Amino acid sequence: LISAEVLFSSVGWILLLALIQILIAIFRKPLIKLYVFLITILELASLKKRLMAIPRMTAAMPASFGILCIAVFITGLCTSWHNKTAFHKLMSGKTIGEVEHTLTEKDHAVLYLPIYRLDFSIYANQLAAHQITQLIRAAHTVKVDSCSYRSPNIVLIIGESYGRHHSQQYGYFMETTPRQTALEKSRKLTKFTDVVTCWNLTSFVFKNMLSTHVIGEKGEWCDYPLFPEVFRKAGYNVTFITNEFLPQAKEAVYDFSGGFFLNNPELSKLQFDHRNTQLHDLDDGLLKDYDDSLKTFQKEHNLTIFHLMGQHVNYKLRYRKEQAKFWASSYEEKRPKLTTAQRKMLSHYDNATLYNDSIVAQIVKRFQKEDAVVIYVPDHGEECYEEDRGFICRNHSANIDWPLAHYEFEIPFWIYCSPKYIRNHRDIYRQIRKAKDKRFMT
């Protein structure tokens, strides 16, 4: 026999559940019939009450329903009026860049209905298609009469979200760029001291950096050829290795705006001979792409473009944890006004900058024995609790004051010349050294 102690223990509950399951299995059909009978009785009773209430409801319905509809309409209009005006502004943009900039505003439209999102997608693609047409037309105007190939190997590294005030090279109190600093001391790397970006939004920078259009000239960036097209026409083998702008599902409008002219099939063929095909969690994946396949396509004259993810938010995802050198406690003396959480965020950014230093140094290493020149430039700066401004990333305001210009537009920039390049092109090397303090915009 089973004792009472066993019945009221955990084992007893399991036995009870098993017994219930056995009874349900044995009496399943009678139980189903009983359930159906009870449900039918309840539904008939409910139906009778509803039928008796119909005359009263019908009499009051026209007026009540009309008032309710008006109230709902007025309430909906009042509560969503701001979003409707914001949606109208969004859909009034003349270029995809203008639309993107509108979306950076704090009070931008929220596309909460599927029909809104569909409408916006069609509109954005139409705007992009118009600029694609202009770019293709401009590309076919490119003519190169001759080329000296004085620089047989040109490497362009485009960084991401890198303010120069977090660079050891530019006087930052943390050792975030030890490898670049060492290259600078060797005089192979020339640091430029007064360089600003043309914008603090990646897509805007990419369009203006890759276009031969100069800000201030007539027309738009898409009215002029893209410089990789010019290099291809001149006979250079052009390789583009990006960790950000590849066509992918669920692409944000910012990535679409920055990459649509790179990923259009016709424009891609006009600009690049070779490209990578996948994105990576960390930028060392681009090095593997280059070493495993893209390096084999190098020819006598090459332009190789590396586009890094760099220090883009989320900062803690931009470096390997085992390579971390900075911690929240590292900033207690230098940044005493920051909270522990803010210091932790700052440590993530500086660790990402240190990791970026290692990636850039690895790229330089791959070309140091070639007759090569390597150019490094990030797309724009970045803020990470600078002074008492209290925020990270960027403020995409059209009103540019001094702090915003200082932290988000001032960027590091340098040119590395390999020993072989210096020997073969001393005149170019001297010109680079002479130009290091000149002002210019990317």
Would you name each region that the model predicts?
Residues 1-102:
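Transmembrane and membrane-interface helices of multi-pass
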Residues 142, 288-292, 330-376, 400, ...:
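A long, amphipathic alpha-helix that forms part
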Residues 71-336, 410, 442:
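Active-site-proximal alpha/beta segments of enzymes that process anionic O-linked groups
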Residues 171-175, 372-426:
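Histidine-centered active-site microenvironments of extracellular/periplasmic hydrolases
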Residues 230, 234-240, 293-296, 363-376, ...:
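Catalytic cores of PAPS-dependent sulfotransferases
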Residues 240-242, 303-310, 350-353, 373-378, ...:
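Short beta-strand segments
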Residues 208, 269-272, 334-345, 426-434:
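Short glycine/proline-rich turn/loop motifs
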Residues 218-225, 343-356, 398-411, 422-442:
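A short beta-strand-to-alpha-helix junction
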